[in-house]
Amino acid sequence: MSFNYSMNTPSPSMLSFDMDIPITAFLHNSDVFQLFHPDIMEQVVVNKERVFFPTPSFNVLNLESDCLYKMSLRFDKTNNKRFQFNRQTKQWTEYDKVSNHKESEVFVHPSEIRTGDDWMKSPVEFFIKVTNLRSSESDEVICLESQCKYQPTLLIQKVFRDCFGCFQAHGPPVEIKFALLTFIATTRYCSRRIADIKSSLNPFSSQDTKKKNKRNTLKAVSQEENQPIENSSFHQSFSNQYLSKPDLDLKSTTLLQIAPDHSFEPTNFVSSSHFPCWDSIFCQQSFPTPSSSPYSDSLPHFTNEWNTPTFYNENFMSYPNFPNY
């Protein structure tokens, strides 16, 4: 036994199969689905799985507290006709092409079997993934045919445990249909009004995602301008230990003059490719460590105005303890 409730009846009710206890179900978020009225709601179905949105949520009342129930949502085709969108009237109309006959898809709630008291404590939400790929055999994904109209039906099945511990159905399920949930499956939104409503309701819509990605990109560029050194292990450690001025860039043709207190002063010089010793720093190779003396005479240093190399010596400055990589 089932009833098909019109849009003028937002709170449908239904008698159970034994006609003793009236089982009542309400569309908890009926105000959300009412936004699409009088147009027919559209749901995009493509090869990639997409979440059915908005998420239908139901309040179920008058279940027997100690009895076991199973909730599911069935997707029935309203007919075997396909629909096309008229750009002039902005309405969906039937045309002669007949859709492929297929049994209705049923999505079982992940909670599966619970007591009536548990089902009535809070709204029952159905997070469903839909696709038009027929090869998908997952129980968590519903396959729908594009350009077809569907009517979701809430199924409330009373079950019991037999002597073998298996669950068996106790009579036929209670079926409740909501006209507000009727939709047409399509590969893309045809009605601009429907698309705008869904975009305003969905915080993860493509428009909001693009704006957010643009803000993140501008923020990342701003951070890169304030942090010229590359985010590598060598440069990060090198800057943290030895650089006292954050505006120096290892990529520029500037040599770091080592002072006795291990601070650095930039000095212009000719291209670093003339000196493999300094290229080893920029290429992140191991920096040579003196074996016998803490001072080195092998490091080129440019201090005069002709940019000719001079060398560190014991009387000039100490050699810092560079880390080994």
From Swiss-Prot:
Gene Ontology cellular-component terms listed: chromatin; nucleus
Positions of the DNA-binding region: 32-210
InterPro entries to which the protein is assigned, alphabetical: p53-like_TF_DNA-bd_sf (IPR008967), T-box_DNA-bd (IPR046360), T-box_sf (IPR036960), TF_T-box (IPR001699), TF_T-box_CS (IPR018186)
Domain of life: Eukaryota
Comp. bias regions, Polar residues: 219-236
SMART domains: TBOX (SM00425)
One function term, GO molecular function aspect: sequence-specific DNA binding
Region ranges (Disordered): 204-236
CDD domains: T-box
Inactivation phenotype: Knockout causes abnormal development of the pharynx, when cultured at the restrictive temperature of 23 degrees Celsius, which is exacerbated on a ceh-51 mutant background. Embryonic arrest occurs on a ceh-51 mutant background. Expression of homeodomain protein ceh-51 in embryo is reduced; abolished by simultaneous RNAi-mediated knockdown of pop-1.
Cellular compartment(s): Nucleus
Biological process per Gene Ontology, one example term: nematode pharynx development
Alphabetical UniProt keywords: DNA-binding, Nucleus, Transcription, Transcription regulation
Name this protein carries in UniProt: T-box transcription factor tbx-35
Organism, scientific name: Caenorhabditis elegans
Family matches, as SUPFAM superfamilies: p53-like transcription factors (SSF49417)
UniProt function note: Transcription factor which plays a role in mesoderm development, probably by regulating expression of target genes, such as homeobox protein ceh-51. Binds to DNA consensus motif 5'-[AG]T[GC][GT]CACC[TC][AGCT][AGCT][CT][CT]-3' in promoter elements.
